[in-house]
A protein has these predicted regions:
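N-terminal interaction/assembly modules
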Residues: 1-82, 106, 133-134
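Short alpha-helical segments used as structural interaction elements across diverse proteins
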Residues: 73, 94, 117-121
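N-terminal positioning helix adjacent to the helix-turn-helix/winged-helix DNA-binding module
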Residues: 75-78, 86-90, 121
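Short amphipathic alpha helix immediately N-terminal
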Residues: 85-102
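Helix-turn-helix DNA-binding module
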Residues: 100-117
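DNA major-groove recognition helices of helix-turn-helix
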Residues: 114, 118-132
Length: 134
């Protein structure tokens, strides 16, 4: 695994957590819109099979979302621990890129470096991470 692949693990884990959250919210919205019954007629108190299945599906989506969030937290901490010890501008560039998930343009503004300057620093920082991963 290269240094860049290692550092990008958090971005991927965060993306997966957002996907699971969106799926959960979509399912919740669908259940809410389908389960409304406003015809005024009594329907009994038994939970119907479709309602039970929908609740189980929703619970499964919620569990997947929470597990993905926990994974993202674990991966973020692992990446953060690697970056934390890197001093100077190299550490700051890595932190902004791989922990705060900033775009290159935002990093240039934050550290007051040109695009090329930030990429040179990033290249040096990746070499430091690569040496620590071995």
């Amino acid at each position: 695994m290269t240094a860049k692949e290692f550092l990008r693990q958090y971005e991927e884990a965060e993306r997966k957590a957002r996907q699971h959250k969106a799926e959960y919210e979509r399912e919740l919205e669908m259940i809410g819109s389908v389960s409304l019954n406003m015809d005024g007629m009594p329907h009994g108190s038994n939970i119907s099979k479709p309602t039970e299945e929908a609740a189980l599906k929703l619970a499964d989506k919620a569990l997947r979302w929470k597990m993905a969030e926990l994974d993202a937290i674990r991966v973020r901490q692992m990446v953060y621990d690697t970056i934390y010890d890197i001093k100077g501008i190299e550490g700051q560039v890595l932190y902004e890129r791989y922990i705060n998930l900033h775009k290159w343009e935002e990093i240039c503004v934050l550290v007051h470096y040109s695009w090329q300057g930030v990429h040179k620093v990033h290249k040096r920082a990746l070499a430091i991470v690569e040496s620590r991963l071995k």
